[in-house]
């Protein structure tokens, strides 16, 4: 399977706009995923959160809709109309969710993220329904003694064999830095993660020790220079 964008993408999984603003400033964040739980924790109106994220500069914000297929379609169209530059409508991988996905993506040309993917079969149905993204829940599978990263690999293999290029794999429910690198290694196009995990991607004990050594040696060099002056 060919990654047509020739690059990996990193999304933040949060509705905390202060953290989004902070990490967007790194130039390394490509999008944001939200869900009802994250919105509830923010204590804010969902659309206020979406608007602020868009104002920060993000152009790919997963906005989850709930209800039956008609309700999800109606709400998805409304959100995509209100946020035409950033909305990705997020639906669950259920019969109603996939009906909504097909209507939104194929008839209304709206970007859809099908979430709560726990099996390759669900990823196949989502691709058939025109999903822009499928979101396998790596961490939640691992919690239940099922190899979440293997699911990423299996979905990628099916998509590659069937030449499915439109639907991209968005690895979700990430708990550890290693899951980020392994998601990409196993075929994910995008990984969404909590800000705390993104922050830890910078850190390694050997990097920290190397910086300490460089700092110590730099100070010694400065002392030598000052003595010889």
Model-derived features with residue positions:
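Catalytic cores of alpha/beta
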Residues: 18-25, 74-79, 100, 119-129, ...
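Glycine-enriched alpha-helix->loop->beta-strand junction motifs that scaffold or abut catalytic
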Residues: 27-31, 58, 83-85, 103-112, ...
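Conserved, mostly hydrophobic/aromatic
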Residues: 35, 89, 126, 183, ...
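Active-site-adjacent beta->alpha loops and helix N-cap segments on the catalytic face
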Residues: 41-52, 69-74, 91-106, 119-127, ...
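C-terminal alpha-helical cap/extension of soluble enzyme domains
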Residues: 159-229
